């Protein structure tokens, strides 16, 4: 991707998969992670326990502080604050719901100050359909990020989730331009289901804004 980040905010950190990649790519970066589930959060702490530039907050991000229900998947990285649709279970049968648990939700500004986000900063979101609510929970600090890296779905996998088109439009209105699409997942009929999308703040694009 050719990026250089000094700060990474990892929302939906799970067991630290993305944070490990970020640490490899950006050895000196500060990483602030959010993971509401106790099992994955415990694994994350074990993985990064010796890294003084990594911190973990054990709650989800949303537009307001709350306590709510999380739908726990048999594969915990597919857990969501939104219920699964039959389509999710059909395409990814190993991700069926195994139960629910109560988690806390907060806003990004309640956990970190803008002055702590050394530029360039990246906001990563992997929250299983809850991307728009998570972004709203980050909006006060959104201008601090040069990059947003988010999973986007082209079909509804979780009830009421934002789809990729609306996610792209929301970020575009805030001067973020889609600059890369990675890891596209297709169903058995060859239709795109979801992908990871990289957005860059427009001022970083050599072509300017339109």
Where are these regions (language model features)?
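Phosphate/nucleotide-binding beta-alpha loop and adjacent structural elements of enzyme active sites
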Residues: 1-210
